[in-house]
Amino acid sequence: SELQPVKPVVEFNMVDKRFVEQSDILTDLDNRPNLMELNPFEFENLISNLFRLVGFESKLTRSSRDGGIDVVAYDPRPLLGGKVVIQAKRYKNVVGVSAVRDLYGTMINEGASKGILVTTSHYGPDAYDFAKDKPIELLDGGALLYLLNQHGIEAKIIFPDEFN
């Protein structure tokens, strides 16, 4: 079954040994419009590029040194902005509270003003309960598709039967 887009109801150190050069995955996305067909690195790259389109400065982290962070971004808006840590999960199944707890701990450890957890699937009620009243945004598959569409990227999420 294919998810539909759902409209959501949300000084940066650019020299860091965790950062890697990233490619522009968006130019190749037309060839593989199903996000579930991207490998994990391509998906993380897509998320980094998306947040750049949203208006953030963003850097992809090295897998071996990410400390639970896939993208470190900076939101330049006065008062509302700051350092943002982003975790990308290309999942078929429900993302539970443990992933949100991990992101929150990483966010505090990194001194970030916000954490964003992005998934191709959806979150369980316990994940939303934990994130409530915290500077954490949970972006599910429908909201991700909506955000991509808002920035001119037509994509879809179709879960293959054998994917976990």
Report the location of each language-model feature:
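Mixed-charge (Asp/Glu-Lys/Arg
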Residues: S1-N164
